[in-house]
From Swiss-Prot:
PANTHER family for this protein: HEAT SHOCK PROTEIN 90 FAMILY MEMBER
Function: Molecular chaperone. Has ATPase activity.
Naturally occurring in which organism (per UniProt): Ehrlichia ruminantium (strain Gardel)
Main location: cytoplasm
Annotated stretches, region: A: 1-335
Keywords: ATP-binding, Chaperone, Cytoplasm, Nucleotide-binding, Stress response
Molecular-function annotations in GO: ATP binding; ATP hydrolysis activity; ATP-dependent protein folding chaperone; unfolded protein binding
Cited HAMAP family: HSP90 (MF_00505)
Subcellular location: Cytoplasm
Family statement drawn from the similarity comment of this UniProt entry: Belongs to the heat shock protein 90 family.
Pfam families: HATPase_c_3, HSP90
Name listed for the protein in its UniProt record: Chaperone protein HtpG
Amino acid sequence: MQGTVNSERLKFDAEVGKVLKLVIHSLYTNKDIFLRELISNASDACDKLRYQSLSNQDLMDAGSELKIVISVDKDKNRLYISDNGIGMNREDLINNLGTIAHSGTQKFLDAINSGASSQQGVVELIGKFGVGFYSAFMVASEVIVESCKAGESVGYQWKSSGDGEFVISQLESDQVSRGTRITLALKPEECEFVDKFRIEHIVTTYSYHINYPVYFLNDKGEEERLNSEAAIWTKAKDEISAEEHQNFFRTVAHVGGEPWMILHNKNEGVIEYTNLLYIPSIKPFDLFHPDRKCSVKLYVNKVFITEDNVQIIPQYLRFLKGIIDSSDLPLNISRETLQNNKIIEKIKRSLVKRVLSELKKKAESNIEDYTKFWDNFGSVLKEGLCESMNTEFREELISVCRFYSTHSNDSLISLEDYIERMKPEQNNIYYLTGNDLDSIKKSPQLEGFVSRGVEVLLLVDPVDDFWTNVVTDYQKVPLRSVIRADEDLEKFSDVEKGDESKDSQNEDTQSKEKVDKFIGYAAQVLNNLVSNVRVSKKLTDSPVCLAVADGSMDIRMERFLREQKQLNYKSTKILEINSKHPIISKMIDQYTENGESAMLCNMLHLLLGQACILEGEELQNVSDFAERMNSVLSQIN
């Protein structure tokens, strides 16, 4: 440290003491960021020199390297951060360090905007609020700044203990180098910050991709570089090799395999930002963990800000890995807390539209490859359908969703595919939710639809029970569950070949009067167990099924809410009976000939139990079900 003369003690601006306490004790929740802030300020200083040297070449020696050097003195518990950037004179030190939120960087940007905006592209500035420097007082009992401004020969020292005052002095030496050197007299308990590996970790985490090299001066006087040569996302797309992508993907994704899709874009519209995002080819094991956070890192001019509070990527795109870098992102006084404002929302909308657009292109061009993505992340993507959004945006999201159906066997279809195949007399998009494809394909609910060639979507992800209660239509075509009891399938064309006999079987043996009387009897027997008993218009092979009235809650959704203690009752369902099924036909004959009987009563209860089991509903009384089953079986001749 050099000697000084002409010292002058000055006070910080009004209320600075209170603000300084806020910065030290409240604003920053992570002490590591003090070094990030000081490195960012040093990078700003190098940016300023590089810019001003364009019009005044004497400010910078030809071929000299702009750099940042970190060194330590473990015996004195001191940390040093040096740069050979623009430097500061006495006036700069007082204005920029004596007044919080009086940012030299901000003033510099204003000067560019007012006079030399055509060259603004060469300047990338980080700090906008002028308080990052004061985060040094979180770890230091005293901060000393020695600086000499480019083009000047006199250097100055700024010194403060963060107690409301600072001392400004002139450096004695007439051989002062251009740039700034910051000395932190660390508090005893902050000795970890003189450890080389600790410093390297902080630089790697926060400042790995800034414009200028960051060196650590080791015990031998050798400079070891701590950061990367360049941020990969600043390169043109065609300049990044597959190997570079793979290496960077492994760094940010922490999953195996190769990226399934790479999204590298630079937006230069009203809001400028760059995104380098990857979609993995392997599903992370913790994709559905409730504490899982977004894995997209936020940078401001290549300085890492956070990945914990990024609101730019919605939860339903949490499988994205990579970075977003912008100079337009607003920050609250600290770089740690992002403002939730219109700029962030605009970036979010732009990013989401771009991601959905690329997914749609892939789905339309290569459904086999897209199926791999959908198997990994389709259920996550559908979570977005449950969120509040305008119709246009929701339909964009639905357009990239793919579904199984009764028409497609085991291949995926889009809702556009479904609508194109709808029958002329069909007004709804029909769907059925279930646990898995194998079981849902055997559901009695599908029989009438399949026999008439009406396509039904087969939805087997847990999230399907939720979004189908939010999304009511697509392209103005209503979505409708096949479990609705009032669905009339008679308007559709005759059953397909091979099924005619099923629909016509016994049609002359059962009169409507006999059926109606039996239905009335069944409703009387089952009384409080069902809300109604009716003849089914959709069953062809099964004797019975459960149904719900239009407007009632879906069976699976109601069960989920009960399990989550969000619903404290169980609604009664409608029992639909296939009057042409052999079992039901015999029961009708027996009732017509002999009237009520214990056997018929038991069989009706067993059929209701069967319908409940097929829908995943709990039996109201398992012991009663077993007793009735044994009673019926005991009468077999």
